[in-house]
Structure formats: structure tokens, C-alpha cells
UniProtKB/Swiss-Prot annotation:
Gene Ontology terms: cellular component: nucleus; tRNA methyltransferase complex
Annotated catalytic residues: 143
Catalyzed reaction equations: guanosine(46) in tRNA + S-adenosyl-L-methionine = N(7)-methylguanosine(46) in tRNA + S-adenosyl-L-homocysteine
PROSITE patterns with a match to the protein in the record: SAM_MT_TRMB
Family named by the database record: Belongs to the class I-like SAM-binding methyltransferase superfamily. TrmB family.
SUPFAM superfamilies referenced in this protein's UniProt entry, alphabetically: S-adenosyl-L-methionine-dependent methyltransferases (SSF53335)
Residues that hold S-adenosyl-L-methionine according to the record: 64, 87-88, 120-121, 140, 218-220
UniProt pathway: tRNA modification; N(7)-methylguanine-tRNA biosynthesis
Species classification: Eukaryota, Metazoa, Ecdysozoa, Arthropoda, Hexapoda
Superkingdom field: Eukaryota
Keywords: Methyltransferase, Nucleus, RNA-binding, S-adenosyl-L-methionine, Transferase, tRNA processing, tRNA-binding
Protein name: tRNA (guanine-N(7)-)-methyltransferase
Amino acid sequence: MEVDSKKSSDVVTKLPQKRFYRQRAHSNPIADHSFQYPAHPDEYEWSQHYPDIGDRRVAFADIGCGYGGFLVTLGEIYPDKFAVGMEIRVKVSDYVMDRIDALRKLHEGQYRNVACIRTNAMKYLTNFFHKAQLEKMFFLYPDPHFKKAKHKWRIINSALLSEYSYVLRKGGLIYTVTDVRDLHEWMCKHIEQHPAFERLSEAEVEADILSEKLLDSSEEGKKVTRNKGDKFVAIFRRV
């Protein structure tokens, strides 16, 4: 996407630099953070994030969106769909918000379909989304919580899967990616055991337009690539 030279000379907007938004890799999802959230999805003013949303609803949710690389890619691939990133870390969510704001100024009329909200998706997901609202949910490189005592904090678990099945429409998809084999096996086991989901075949995964983007669009994915790490992908359908 090229920016008109005259227009770019008149605009001093620059993309934010991550080095000014550094924060620890993960945040405790059980801690008592201070969040603002609606009592019901109808009470949330989505227009504050999406100027053109009108009566439409968000279709994609990137849970733990990190620095927003994949979220921005979603906005480019699906210009007619609204995607939200949910991030618990304050500095990281600030970066994504500033990044989207800068992209909108640099590319007039674009990136108006993506936004980031600082919240705890493990606690407040159903406060933001109606039943059967979402078409896709993404869990890219989530915190592995290696210690067994902290496995209950993992973003994929039996209790939370019931909430995900509630906000996902029939035929909707859950995408998971991690560089930790143990976490990959954990997520697959729990999702496959849940009666509301079925795993896509390898052929279906390969045919999905987002499969390649899942691996390297996010900043974490690029880091894993640089370090020559493994990447484990699985996609599940809401039945």
C-alpha cells in the first residue's frame, strides 16, 4: 500500500515504535485488574472503535492479540468484516490502539474495520459478544503456563470452551497456533473433547485462506521463525 507523496509530506503521522511500549511477555489473568466492561453486549458503543460499523457487529475476535500484527492482517484480508483484538497488557494494548490510529491516518479510508480493546477475555467475553455472534476466534501463541498448578489459567480449558461455543455461530471457527508442543496437545485434547467442536482435517486447514497468515503475521510468529522454532496449528469448527 503506497501513500501518495504529497499527502504523506503533509502528514507527520508515523507508526508507533514497540520499544516505547515494552512490557513483560504475559500477564496474570486471575489478578484483579481494573477494566471497564459492559453489563450486556447491547450496552457497548462499538462506534467508538469503528466509525462505519452502524448496526453491524464484530465478526472476528483475536484473543490476546499481542502487538496487533495478525489483527491488522485480518483487516486487510477482510475489509468488509469487523475484527477486534482483546489484550490484557496495558502497554501492549496502547501500542495496538496507537498503531491502528496511525494506519488510519496514513491510509485514508482503510483499517477502519479493526480495533483493540484492553480487557480480560477470560472473564468478560460474554459481556462484549452476543450468542452466536462471532464467525472466527483466534488464539495465537497464548501463554503456555508451563507449571501444572497454573494450567487452569490457560486460555483454552473446558469451562472457557463453553463460553467460546456460546459466542461462536454454528460453523464458526477457532484457530490455535503455538510453538509449544505440550500446549498444542493440551488445546487439541480439550477442544476435541468438547461436544460443541470438531477438528478440521489437514486438507481443510491447508485450504483455509488464513493458514499461512497464522504462522508469520503476528510479531510472536515472526520471532519463532527467526529462532527457527516449531509451529503447531489446529483449527476447529463449531458444530
